[in-house]
Amino acid sequence: MTTLTIDAKLFTDALRRVLPHAEKPNSGTPILENVRFTVRGSWLVIQATDRYTVGESRVPLSEVDAAAELDVLADAARVRALVTALRRDALVMLTDDEDEVTLSGAYVTPLDVHRVRDWPAVDRLWPAELGEGVEGPLALNVATLKKLSALPQSTAERRDEVPTFHSVKPGGPVVVLFGEDTRVLAMPGRVNADRARARFGDWHPAA
């Protein structure tokens, strides 16, 4: 049996940054209505995607827990309820008992989770390295901006931090970094640079 013990405050902060990227219930793609938990090195990585964005946040693990092998999914709607119910000063336990995997904490009902299957290969979408910033106009739809707005609100200690935007090539995916432990991959919309400049120029008519 494997049990990971995680600080509830770090855990819930990470989830609040990731949950906006999970697909909504009854979306027609039930696999994306989950949140993924996987151990990578000395981190528990929490991931969600709705095909248009990928959100990841990580929580540090002890040396003992970092040796665990774990890759599971949990229903995003039930994880949201768990986040609301968890006490911030509690510990969260992610337990793999061969027959079942559970996510539990003080004063909350244990949540059954499932081993990963059919999860989209979103890890390969991340670029190997980042550019210096975003070149040219950047178009992000309102839904994506709403998801990104959850980043600085997730924890009071980080409200003075700002997300940074990076791209590998014009028109390609945009990577948004927030602090050291959260990243988002977003697909930009199409933008006509000449039209954008013309629209901006309308605000500054010639004398």
Label the predicted regions.
Residues 1-207:
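DNA polymerase processivity clamps
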